[in-house]
């Protein structure tokens, strides 16, 4: 008999976005930003991180990634949902 694992962070994050009727493309985009944020910080759990790590990530996007302000805002929105609307 196979044991069922509880859903992981990313799956729960997606499900919460979907439950709040976010568009499919928004859900996909937010998931990608969450994955990039987690990889940037060595796959640490978001509970172990906070404002400082979010700011580090956004600064990295602006300086190293040379992304536009609107792209930074999109990443910030995904992380705000993680920290304010999800956990």
Where are the regions a protein language model picked out?
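Intrinsically disordered, low-complexity and often Lys/Arg-enriched segments
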Residues: 1-7
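N-terminal core-binding DNA-recognition domain of tyrosine recombinases/integrases
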Residues: 11-25, 31-87
């Amino acid at each position: 008999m196979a044991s069922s694992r509880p859903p992981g962070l990313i799956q729960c994050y997606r499900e919460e976005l979907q439950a709040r009727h976010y568009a499919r493309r928004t859900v996909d985009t937010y998931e990608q930003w969450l994955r990039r944020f987690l990889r940037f910080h060595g796959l640490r759990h978001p509970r172990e991180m906070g404002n400082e790590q979010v700011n580090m990530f956004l600064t990295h996007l602006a300086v190293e990634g040379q992304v536009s302000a609107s792209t930074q805002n999109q990443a910030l929105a995904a992380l705000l949902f993680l920290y304010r609307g999800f956990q």
